[in-house]
Amino acid sequence: MRKYIESKGGTFYFDTEMTDFTTENNVLKAVKLSNGEEIETNICVLAIGHSARDTFEMIFNKGINMEQKPFAIGVRVEHPQEKINKSQYGFSDNRLGAASYKLTYKTDNGRGVYSFCMCPGGFVVNAASEKETCVVNGMSYSKRDSRNANSAIVTTVTPQDYPSKHPLAGVEFQRKLERKAFAEGNGNIPIQRLEDFRNNKKTEALGKITPEIKGKYSFGNLNNVLPEYVCKSISDAMEYFERKIEGFNDNDTIMSAVESRTSSPVRIIRDENYQSNVRGLIPAGEGAGYAGGITSAAIDGIKIFEFIGKIFTNRKIFVRA
């Protein structure tokens, strides 16, 4: 795909950051790059990731209108893949491949709890993007053949949970939890057995489930990382999920923290023509607050492409499958 785009005149800048932009009469004039280059343009699609905190801060300081947005936080849980297979298929057979699942629950106080980014036969990884923070994520290799299945189990948080009304308060909310996770694991991923999590007690030894984690981990107490309402929501949800998947609520289930990058805590405001308050600066995708995963981000990208194509061709264009 890269070579095709380059053959049509496109250019890729690797290891290069957009550090600034200039305007004239509130219209985009140029973007500045970390390599010192300045590119004159009147259209820039701001398709940043949901962890691009430096860019959030830069555009906020430049006067781009932004607002708080709900997202979800929680933990990664690990179970033996064989147990998931037996629950989903009725038996375990390698020819069927590693089974997956999708789970949802609503707490008594109205918060949603759900599985997210489930990784069959996968690994938990440290995905921190800032110093002295810990962020967990999941991944599977193509064979999906590790011993464990893992998934995020997260609960919804809203701007009412954030420390202030500042548009970037959700980012600070994330950052605080990620620093707590780093401290709880002494710089490693903090893990805990589900039984110990419920008893608010630091794990001292593993049970019958061994973690599949890329990188170092340390025993900890995730109650020291997450707000009480999140811990309660997850604990209740794990009991409910046992009705769907036998063994999901096993005392030896491995939990790791903190899963805090489910989606963007910020939305960059755009109008009906996809424009920010600087004309030509077009927020798009998950980091901009208009998607909640790969598929919805791709759909938003298609809408932006069709809009920009109309500008250049003066006619409607459509993406066809």
Give the location of each predicted region.
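Residues forming the flavin
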Residues: M1-A321
